[in-house]
């Protein structure tokens, strides 16, 4: 069951409707209210719209809340390659080393999907644990190698993040 205003807030965020979102937020609604699917507005927001994220975060949205599948918004942004949204989340103290249900960090997901700019940012400009192994024992570089993301592998190796691998 949805919490009060959860559906409306999530719907506005998912559509990227900044006007409706702002109007709802002015009514002091619970910014972490869940919709009927158990997800918050931040979790369903249009990822390519960092201003939606910024508005929600300014009102106190928790960037580290996980959905039922174990993903926080930073996992979604990294996996989908939305660097601008990922940077906005980090500005508001999202945990760059938060694990999903499989032990993957945002870096693992970006590397697996081949999002070179996201991987580069995470490796060079954050405290992302590049040597972290997921529950299967794979590092982000292992996943990049496994999925044929050769540019990502080269970038990680050039920045000292290629280390020991399960795949050798």
UniProtKB/Swiss-Prot annotation:
Alphabetical list of PROSITE patterns matching this protein: ANK_REP_REGION, ANK_REPEAT
GO annotation, cellular component aspect: cytoplasm; cytosol; nucleus
ANK repeat extents: 4-33, 37-65, 69-98, 102-132
GO BP terms: negative regulation of cell growth; negative regulation of cell population proliferation; negative regulation of stem cell proliferation; oligodendrocyte differentiation; regulation of G1/S transition of mitotic cell cycle; stem cell proliferation
Tree of life domain: Eukaryota
Signal peptide positions (record): none
Subunit structure: Heterodimer of p18 with CDK6.
Family statement: Belongs to the CDKN2 cyclin-dependent kinase inhibitor family.
Stated name of the protein: Cyclin-dependent kinase 4 inhibitor C
Organism whose genome encodes this protein: Homo sapiens
